[in-house]
């Protein structure tokens, strides 16, 4: 039997405790061997952030240092051109049975992605509820967890305002943000 591998795509700008909680809940409930944290290389759905892919890769490595459930993957960072999940899943397919981990907000928008039918064909999908977006019906597994009201944009806002971010990100992520002078 092939290992079940969770795939969590994110801008990782920065990764936060909500990502960690989702990965831990999914790993336990879905019997995942590991969860790949896949920082988006070149976003296809929004303008690229000021923090380039290598900066966001280092943040993914930092969260993986604090949360052993994660393994940071460079699959999108190293691939030229826009990042599309259908392509990412194709590249990761040899690793095992893939389970794409999504928040309910992302799942609700799945049909707007490039080649959503290929995404569905290349993996199982597991969905966790996000604040403000109830779990939609559909052909997916459910990740039971308390919704965590944290966002990367809130972390960036707090850093810019000089407010604490302790408890919103892991210690290694906070240290990387401070060391690199990010979001100022």
Model-derived segments and spans:
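Nucleotidyltransferase catalytic core that binds NTPs
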Residues: 1-184
């Amino acid at each position: 039997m092939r290992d079940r591998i969770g795939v969590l795509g994110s801008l990782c700008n920065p990764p936060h405790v909500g990502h960690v909680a989702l990965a831990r809940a999914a790993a336990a409930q879905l019997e995942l061997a590991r969860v790949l944290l896949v920082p988006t290389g070149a976003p296809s759905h929004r303008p690229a952030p000021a923090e380039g892919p290598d900066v966001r890769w280092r943040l993914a490595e930092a969260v993986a240092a604090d949360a052993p459930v994660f393994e940071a993957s460079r699959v999108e960072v190293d691939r030229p051109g826009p990042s599309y999940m259908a392509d990412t899943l194709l590249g990761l397919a040899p690793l095992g049975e893939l389970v794409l981990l999504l928040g309910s907000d992302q799942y609700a928008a799945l049909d707007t992605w490039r080649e959503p039918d290929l995404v569905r064909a290349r993996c199982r999908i597991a969905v966790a509820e996000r604040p403000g977006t109830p779990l939609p019906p559909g052909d997916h597994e459910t990740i039971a967890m308390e919704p965590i009201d944290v966002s990367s944009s809130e972390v960036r806002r707090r850093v810019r305002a000089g407010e604490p971010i302790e408890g919103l990100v892991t210690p290694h992520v906070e240290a990387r943000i401070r060391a690199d002078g990010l979001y100022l």
